[in-house]
Each structure stands twice: as C-alpha cells, then as structure tokens.
C-alpha cells in the first residue's frame, strides 16, 4: 500500500499558485490510517514519550492516535482564543500568509519528552513556532513528525537540531 496514493492534490487552493495536499482520502481508509500510525511508531526514537502535541486542526487526527498508542497525553496547539486557560503564544509565517498559535502554559512539565505531530511540513513556520511553544513550557522535543513533507519549500531547514520524520515526500 502506497500512502502517497491517498493524498489528493488540489491546484490553486487556498490561493492561486498553491498545490494543496488533501489528506482526507487517506482518512477515509482505515487500512491507510493504520499503516500511517504503524510507520510513525516504527520511526520514533526509543524511550518514553510523555506528551504528543498536535497542531490545529489536521494535526489532531494522527496526534491523538499516536498518544493513545504511546500511552501519552495529547496536547492541542490551537489558533488564538480557542484555549480556555492561560496560554503561551507564538507568531509564525506560513506558505500562504501569517498567523499565531497558542498552548496552555501548564500543558507540559519541565523535562517531559514531547512528540510534535502535524499533517504537512511546508515552510516550517508552524512547526518551528510549535517547537518554541513546547520549549517555553519546559518540554524536550524527541521528534517532529509529519504525514506529508513539501521538500521544495525547505521547511526542514527551520527545524535544524530536531529529529524530523515525514512519511510522504513531494520534491
């Protein structure tokens, strides 16, 4: 089974010139989802992972599944104003604009081992901002993993010093 065959490309979405990678066909297929989780688990570094951070909103899908498999807590990183408790905030640039993200201040204890997950690594801005949020909370990032990586945007360059794993790559 080739996971890449479950990703649909949508031209000029969300704006002209962007080739959007739609993972919903993969989400519709239970076997494809199971394979993705199995491959993520196989590529994790050894050792205990305390928390899995998922980035709003498509990062939540696999982050929750990985948290369950790892017997770890799940932490949502969300857009501003969506979390009810005190938060840390980080601004970032993305492929088609700019935004900011928030995490609950008390979501991670100092020294906890954290896995970061998102659906797509594009420019790296979202993931880099989330790494900063995790570190503000005192977490140690063990890996940043992604379902899809757009290698031509060189997002991995913003994640220097972190272990990065992507299951599907577009050159």
Curated annotation (Swiss-Prot):
Entry GO MF terms: adenine binding; adenine phosphoribosyltransferase activity; AMP binding
Assembly and interaction partners: Homodimer.
Protein name (record): Adenine phosphoribosyltransferase
Source superkingdom: Bacteria
Chief location of this protein within or outside the cell: cytoplasm
Described function: Catalyzes a salvage reaction resulting in the formation of AMP, that is energically less costly than de novo synthesis.
Membership in a protein family: Belongs to the purine/pyrimidine phosphoribosyltransferase family.
NCBIfam families referenced in this protein's UniProt entry, alphabetically: apt, PRK02304.1-3, PRK02304.1-5
Pfam families: Pribosyltran (PF00156)
InterPro entries: Ade_phspho_trans (IPR005764), PRibTrfase_dom (IPR000836), PRTase-like (IPR029057), UPRTase/APRTase (IPR050054)
Annotated source species: Christiangramia forsetii (strain DSM 17595 / CGMCC 1.15422 / KT0803)
Subcellular location: Cytoplasm
Keywords annotated in UniProt: Cytoplasm, Glycosyltransferase, Purine salvage, Transferase
Gene Ontology biological-process entries: adenine salvage; AMP salvage; purine ribonucleoside salvage
């Amino acid at each position: 089974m080739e996971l890449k065959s479950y990703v649909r490309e949508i031209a000029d979405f969300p704006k002209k010139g962007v080739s959007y990678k739609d993972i919903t066909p993969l989400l519709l297929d239970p076997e494809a989802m199971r394979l993705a989780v199995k491959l993520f688990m196989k590529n994790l570094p050894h050792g205990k992972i305390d928390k899995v951070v998922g980035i709003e909103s498509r990062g939540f899908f696999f982050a929750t599944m990985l948290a369950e498999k790892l017997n770890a807590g799940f932490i949502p990183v969300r857009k501003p104003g969506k979390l009810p408790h005190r938060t840390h905030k980080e601004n970032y640039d993305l492929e088609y604009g700019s935004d900011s993200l928030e995490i609950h201040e008390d979501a991670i204890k100092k020294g906890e081992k954290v896995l970061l997950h998102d659906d797509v690594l594009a420019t790296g801005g979202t993931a880099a901002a989330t790494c900063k949020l995790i570190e503000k909370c005192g977490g140690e990032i063990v890996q940043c993993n992604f379902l899809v990586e757009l290698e031509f945007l060189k997002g991995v360059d913003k994640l220097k010093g972190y272990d990065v794993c992507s299951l599907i790559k577009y050159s």
